[in-house]
Structures are given as structure tokens and as C-alpha cells.
Amino acid sequence: MPHSYGIRARTRYTFQRGFREHGQIRLSTYLKTYKVGDIVDIKVNGAVQKGMPHKYYHGKTGVVYNVTQSSVGVLIYKVVGNRYMEKRVNVRIEHVKHSKCRQDFLDRVKANEAKRKEAKAQGKTVQLRRQPAPPAKAHFVSTENNEPVTLHPVAYDTTI
């Protein structure tokens, strides 16, 4: 039963550094550029206490709305009751990383553009929309060496 309700209460494993990731923070963390409109993930780095967001925001994805020298402002939507509340959180860059949530979409856009150019050069039309997977091919099941088995439920038996 916890008794303290501090800002970092019950974060023993949440703010833990990863395996073999202890020690000094990599320089690449500070060399990344963030622009307004970038989609970022908040991942708290337990080694840096300054600019640390509340534990609720750990693992959340938001949009950068403000950039300063050592921190970024992130816009996050928090579920409160039956509505979404817009939260603006100022976080140091050690606790933020670029999100990969749009990478699949951007790769698909590039692939579609290449397909469109190729089809235009050949004078053909191409289907660029994703299609659902078709149903499995029809086939016959042989019972020659594969006898059907009838399954019955096992009766419940109490052993007291």
C-alpha cells in the first residue's frame, strides 16, 4: 500500500534506463532538430531530472507546438472522463524523440509515386489504394489418409 503521492511515485521501472544504456547521454540526443508540427514520442530519461514530464505523459505521442534552446512544447490529448482535453507539456529534449508512427505512411507515399510515374510512362492505369487480403483459394480435402475425428467436450469432474 503506497503512502506517498509524489510526482515520481511508483515510477521505479517506468523511468528506468534500458539495458546497457546507463551513463552519459549520447550526443546525438542533443543534435536532433525539432520543428513546429513534428510528431514526437515522450520517453522519460531517468538520468535527467530537469524538464521531466509527469509520469502520465511517458509513452504518449504528441505534436511540437513550441521550440526553445533546450526544450520543446508538446501538444497532447488526454482522455478525461468522456472527452479529450488538450494538454501543453514543456519537456526537455532528453525526454523526447521523433516518432516513427508516420514512417509506414511516408514509405507508401513514395512507393505510390514511383508506381504512378512508371504507369504514366507506359500509358497504363495503376491501382494505388490498399486492397484487403483476398479469401484463401478453394481446395478439396482428401480423407484417404486423413480420417475425420469427432471431438467431444471433457466432462467436468470435481476431485475433492
From Swiss-Prot:
GO molecular function: structural constituent of ribosome
GO cellular component: cytosol; cytosolic large ribosomal subunit; preribosome
Subcellular location: Cytoplasm
Biological process annotations from GO: cytoplasmic translation
Keyword flag Magnesium: no
Region (Disordered): 114-138
InterPro entries recorded: Ribosomal_eL21, Ribosomal_eL21_CS, Ribosomal_eL21_sf, Translation_prot_SH3-like_sf
Keyword annotations: Cytoplasm, Ribonucleoprotein, Ribosomal protein
Note from the entry: There are 2 genes for eL21 in S.pombe.
The protein's assembly and partners: Component of the large ribosomal subunit (LSU). Mature yeast ribosomes consist of a small (40S) and a large (60S) subunit. The 40S small subunit contains 1 molecule of ribosomal RNA (18S rRNA) and at least 33 different proteins. The large 60S subunit contains 3 rRNA molecules (25S, 5.8S and 5S rRNA) and at least 46 different proteins.
Biological role stated in the UniProt entry: Component of the ribosome, a large ribonucleoprotein complex responsible for the synthesis of proteins in the cell. The small ribosomal subunit (SSU) binds messenger RNAs (mRNAs) and translates the encoded message by selecting cognate aminoacyl-transfer RNA (tRNA) molecules. The large subunit (LSU) contains the ribosomal catalytic site termed the peptidyl transferase center (PTC), which catalyzes the formation of peptide bonds, thereby polymerizing the amino acids delivered by tRNAs into a polypeptide chain.
Family: Belongs to the eukaryotic ribosomal protein eL21 family.
Entry protein name: Large ribosomal subunit protein eL21A
